[in-house]
């Protein structure tokens, strides 16, 4: 949904502030969703990334195990993409790059998009977790008392970036429950 498009754009914006090198692959459905739900153009999103690739470009450097990276975030991760990654169906650059992360034992974080979940979804998530992937459903948190949608979205962004050792000072962390006197 639109919160995912907003979240993913915010993630790229925060990564740009850290000077991290980012490589962006946008599926055709993601491109259509971005335009439909946010009004952003592909150029708006692509300019936030260091490099962008067509999902068809399986010869891109990120499709190789020799490409040096800290890992990969798939956001949003549809159940179709999740199933493709789990089964090694590397039929596009997105699933191929995720396959490379698994074979090279690199960090692979999947921000799954679906509710409710059926048994197939859960089994795919379990098997990918066993393979080393991190399933990070973008669920809102309320312990940080978000005041608006942006704060809810950024909580997920910060939790995702934490997986890569990118700890931003703007992130609100759990500090325990305040005891009433």
Please tell me what each predicted stretch does.
Residues 134, 138-181:
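Glycine-rich phosphate/pyrophosphate-binding loop and the adjoining helix
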Residues 25-48:
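N-terminal beta-loop-helix "entrance" segment that forms/cooperates
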Residues 7-17, 93-101:
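Histidine-anchored nucleotide/phosphate-binding helix
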Residues 51, 58-123, 128:
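Helix-loop-strand module that forms the ligand-binding subsite of alpha/beta enzymes
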Residues 20-29, 110-112, 137:
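Short internal beta-strands
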Residues 1-6:
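Short, small-residue-biased leader/transition segments that mark boundaries at the very start
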Residues 39-44, 70, 126-129, 153-155:
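Short, hinge-like loop/turn segments at secondary-structure boundaries
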